[in-house]
Amino acid sequence: YNNWEVIYVIGDLFLKENYVLDGNFLYVRCEDSYLHLLKKLVLSIKYLNEIFIINKGILRCGDDLIINENNLIKFLDDRTTKYDYYGHNPYGKNYICSGNTRNELKKIKKDNFMINYYASHCDDFLNPQHNLKNVNISLYSMRPDIYGASGVIYYISNKACKTLILHMEKINYNILHYDSFTKSYPYTIEDCAVSFIMYFNGINFINSYLFYDSPLHDTIAKHTNKHK
């Protein structure tokens, strides 16, 4: 699409190499679990930057979307304005960083999203590719009380991508890392974690209705898994 590569990313914990690019499929040596989505995302960004010269950024898409190709092509056009961290959330609000942002990140809440997910996906604990043996999900439910782009589909610029890589390198890509600054576990839910990393590093979130599922706007995608 307009010289933008389309790459499908698959985690393979037992891959001998760090990554393998096979056509449009990028296999990354990491867990292929829901809990490890952030790790898979950032590692894939790191390796894609080794493989390709990325001029603008990355449009991160879930695997449960119906794409409107005409709207996608319009978005990818160089003349379309794109922000460093750009997507849509249910609140329909931007988040603009300020001198008080880091204090705001210290506000935390209990989020049972992953607990509820794994309550109905118990077989995942038995899958060696997921590397969840002896992981007690309930211990990692506290996270910063923030909003940002929903993980369905969002755009991150090269600046944002570099920020994600540098931040995750510092914690050795450990999504169960305890963050002493917020006294929480910010990295277990991918979209929440991306928001946290962006705001911690002073990158704003810009909301737009053009990404997905807006009845009043022509969007890039329809989220087919919305109600499951």
Please report, for each region that a protein language model flagged, where it lies by residue.
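Short, acidic, metal-binding catalytic loop of nucleotide-sugar glycosyltransferases
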Residues: Y1-W4
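Structural beta-sheet core signal
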Residues: V6-Y8, R60, Y85
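Active-site-proximal specificity loops/subdomain of glycosyltransferases
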Residues: I7-K56, E69
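Structured beta-strand/turn binding interfaces of compact recognition modules in eukaryotic regulators
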Residues: V9-D12, E31, G62, N89, ...
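Eukaryotic basic, amphipathic alpha-helical target segments in cytosolic regions
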Residues: F14, N49-F52, T80, E169-N172, ...
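The conserved acidic donor/metal-binding loop of glycosyltransferases
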Residues: I58, G62-I66
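Conserved catalytic core of nucleotide-sugar-dependent glycosyltransferases
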Residues: L65-F196, F200
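PAPS-dependent sulfotransferase catalytic core
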Residues: G202-K228
